Amino acid sequence: MCDQTFLAITFGPCDKCSENKPLMNIYLKNEPINYCSLCVEMMACQGLAKGETVQSLKAESESLKAKLEEERAKLHDVELHQVAEKMEALGQFVMKTRRTLKGHGNKVLCMDWCRDKRRIVSSSQDGKVIVWDAYTTNKEHAVTMPCTWVMACAYAPSGCAVACGGLDNKCSVYPLSLDKNENLASKKKSVAMHTNYLSSCSFTKSDMQILTSSGDGTCALWDVESGQLLQSFHGHSADVLSLDLAPSETGSTFVSGGCDKKANVWDMRSGQNVQSFETHDSDINSVKYYPSGDAFASGSDDATCRLYDLRADREVAIYSKDSIIFGASSVDFSLSGRLLFAGYNDYNINVWDVLKGTRVAILFGHENRVSTVRVSPDGTAFCSGSWDNTLRIWA
C-alpha cells in the first residue's frame, strides 16, 4: 500500500500502464511514482487482498510512532534551562507602545513587515487590507477584499507587492505603486486556490513563488506569475493554521502547525514531511523559526509555547505559568533569539527568556485578544495586531 497520497494532478504517461492520463503523485516506500487513478485503485485492491486493512495500517503506524518516541526519550537527558543555569540573567526589560495604528473597522487578524523596516501590511475581519507607514501611522494603500475574515497577508521581499487571502479560499497578489490613489483592486492577480479558507501565506526568497496553508489540511507552493501549483504538502489531518519559512541560508524547508496538534517540517523540493512533533494538547496557532534555523517555537490553545530543536529532534523547552490559562495566538523571536514574544487571548503579550524559560515582561495595552505579533526586520521594534481593531508598535 502507498504511505502517502497527493491530490495534485498532472498529465502524462502512467508509470504502471504507460498510458497518457491524469496522474496522481503518490509515494510508495518513500519513492515518488506517478499512477493514473485506475492503477491506484488496482494497487489498493491488491493491498486489501493481502490483508492490509485501514485498521492494520493504523496499528502499524502507531507502533512506529511509539518506537520513535522511545528513541527520542533515550536522548532526552537534559533540559534547556538546566544548560543555561549559569548564564547571566537579562537586565531590566523596558518596552512600551510608541505608535498605535487605527483604521480597521473590525478585528485585525494578520500583519507583516516590509523589508524596508518602515512599512506594514495588515488584514482584518472587515475585509480590508491596509499598507501603513509605521513611522507616521499614515495609510499608504487600502484594498477591500471580496470577502470578510482576511486571515493571511504578506509583504513581497522586494516591497513591491502584497499577498492576502481568507474565506475566499484564494491567495491574491496586489502590486504596489508610488501612486497612492491608484486602484489596486484592478491589478489583482489570483495566484493560489484551496478548497477551504486560506490561513497563512508567505513569499519565498523572491517575489516569484508563494507558500500557502489552508483549512483544507494542506500547504502548497505556487508560481506567482502563472498561478501554477509547484508542490503540495499533505500530512496534517486537520486545518493548517500557520507556517514559517526557514531562514534562507539554512535550506529549502518550512514548518507548519495546525488543529491536529502537530508541527511538521517540510522539504519544499520533494514535498516530503521530514520531521514531525506532537507534544501540544490543543491546536497549534503559530509557528516561528529560531533565527539560526536550528529550532522553532510554537504557540498553542493549550496556553503554552514550546521550543523544538531540529538537530536533537525533540522538544527542549516549555514556556508556561499556572496563571496563564488562555491560548497563545502568535509567537516571534527577537533578532538575537534570546527573547520570545507571544501574544495571548487574555489581551496580553508575554516576553520569555528563551534559554532560561522564565517570563521577563508582560506588555499591556490591547483591549481584546492579541492575534498577531511580528518583530521588525532590524529587531528594533515589534508590531502586534488585536481584535480591538488596532495595531501597536512597541519599542
Swiss-Prot record:
Effect of inactivating the gene: No visible phenotype; due to the redundancy with gnb5a. Simultaneous knockout of gnb5a and gnb5b results in no striking dysmorphologic features, but the larvae show impaired swimming activity, remain small, and generally die 7-14 days post fertilization (dpf), most likely as a result of their inability to feed.
Signal peptide: none
GO CC terms: cytoplasm; heterotrimeric G-protein complex
Any one GO molecular-function label of the UniProt entry: signaling receptor complex adaptor activity
Domain of life of the source: Eukaryota
Cell compartments where the protein resides: Membrane
CDD domains noted in UniProt: WD40
WD repeats: 103-142, 145-184, 193-234, 235-276, 279-318, 320-362, 365-395
SMART domains from the UniProt entry: WD40 (SM00320)
Database matches in InterPro entries: G-protein_beta_WD-40_rep, Gprotein_B, Guanine_nucleotide-bd_bsu, WD40/YVTN_repeat-like_dom_sf, WD40_repeat_CS, WD40_repeat_dom_sf, WD40_rpt
Any GO BP annotation: G protein-coupled dopamine receptor signaling pathway
Xref: PROSITE patterns: WD_REPEATS_1, WD_REPEATS_2, WD_REPEATS_REGION
Keywords: Membrane, Repeat, Transducer, WD repeat
Stored Pfam families: WD40_Gbeta (PF25391)
Function noted in UniProt: Enhances GTPase-activating protein (GAP) activity of regulator of G protein signaling (RGS) proteins, such as RGS7 and RGS9, hence involved in the termination of the signaling initiated by the G protein coupled receptors (GPCRs) by accelerating the GTP hydrolysis on the G-alpha subunits, thereby promoting their inactivation. Increases RGS7 GTPase-activating protein (GAP) activity, thereby regulating mood and cognition. Increases RGS9 GTPase-activating protein (GAP) activity, hence contributes to the deactivation of G protein signaling initiated by D(2) dopamine receptors.
UniProt subunit comment: May interact with RGS9; this interaction stabilizes both proteins and increases RGS9 GTPase-activating protein (GAP) activity, hence accelerating the deactivation of D(2) dopamine receptor-mediated signaling.
Family to which the UniProt record says this protein belongs: Belongs to the WD repeat G protein beta family.
Annotated protein name in UniProt: Guanine nucleotide-binding protein subunit beta-5b
Organism: Danio rerio
